[in-house]
Amino acid sequence: MVGREDVQSFLEQFHAKMKVFGIIYRDDRGKNRKALEELEIVPSYRKIVIESLVIDDYVEGPVIDTLNKFGEMWVFGKDVKEREVYIKIMISELIPQTICISFHLAEHPLRYPFK
């Protein structure tokens, strides 16, 4: 089972790497682009939301990326403009940048084990 310390360690590594190398967004996924429109936010605002992730926002992970095999994915949730947003991020083993795979409205209520 993942503990608070594991989530904190991941977030520290993720934010440090994001600060140095940046982040790649999977904007080729339609629901990620659509979420920006529905939330009426500019793409760069996602970075602010992701930078503000804390342990209490943790939903699940690490989940193995069996599709692309880039590493482990971690899922978080955050309220943006009073709407719950599903955020899936990862530290890639293959490229220096961090990756935001999903940033879209939650399709169902998220469960936060540390809240």
Question: Where do the language-model regions lie?
Answer:
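Compact soluble domain cores
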Residues: V2-F70
